[in-house]
């Protein structure tokens, strides 16, 4: 249970309040810089927890359970704080909302499908969706650290919209599978 991969996953969950704390004050470029470094570190641990678990035969039920939760907590927290600080504002909130709602819906669908003993493997497109989400949010955090480079914010918002589109497509894939198994 207390394997290195599981500890790395837990460290991501524990780091979320720190990440949010550094993003709390809009306009504090140093805070955004620290948050960006922490966000990158969290992304690296996300990669290594899975890699270490698979390569060392340390895959556990706890890790399988916690890893997607850690990812969703991090994404949801960053989206919410960036909306709260208006780093994601106006029409761009729609893209953020699409991402949040899809994550909630797919979590519910996965729970339902597990109860009817249907496994839905993560598709390659869903992996690209996650990557684009993480790049978008990282870009938006980085934009706060680089206030003299407004194009970084624009790139982050464009990536957020790209992630929202992939979110809808992959969400529809999960919904189609779920609908086949509903009464």
Feature map (PLM): residue ranges:
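Alpha-helical transmembrane bundles and membrane-interface segments of multipass inner-membrane proteins
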Residues: 1-183
């Amino acid at each position: 249970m207390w394997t290195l991969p599981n500890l790395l996953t837990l460290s991501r969950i524990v780091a979320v309040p720190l990440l949010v704390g550094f993003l709390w004050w809009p306009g504090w470029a140093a805070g955004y810089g620290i948050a960006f470094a922490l966000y990158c570190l969290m992304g690296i641990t996300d990669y290594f927890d899975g890699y270490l678990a698979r390569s060392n035969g340390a895959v556990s039920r706890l890790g399988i359970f916690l890893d997607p939760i850690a990812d969703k907590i991090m994404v949801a927290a960053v989206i919410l704080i960036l909306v709260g600080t208006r780093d994601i504002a106006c029409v761009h909130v729609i893209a953020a909302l699409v991402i949040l709602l899809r994550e909630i819906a797919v979590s519910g669908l996965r729970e339902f499908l597990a109860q009817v003993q249907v496994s839905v493997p993560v598709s390659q497109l869903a992996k690209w969706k996650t990557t684009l989400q993480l790049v978008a949010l990282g870009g938006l955090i980085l934009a706060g650290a680089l206030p003299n480079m407004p194009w970084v914010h624009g790139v982050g918002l464009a990536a957020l919209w790209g992630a929202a589109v992939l979110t809808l497509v992959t969400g529809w894939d999960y919904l189609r599978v779920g609908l086949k198994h509903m009464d």
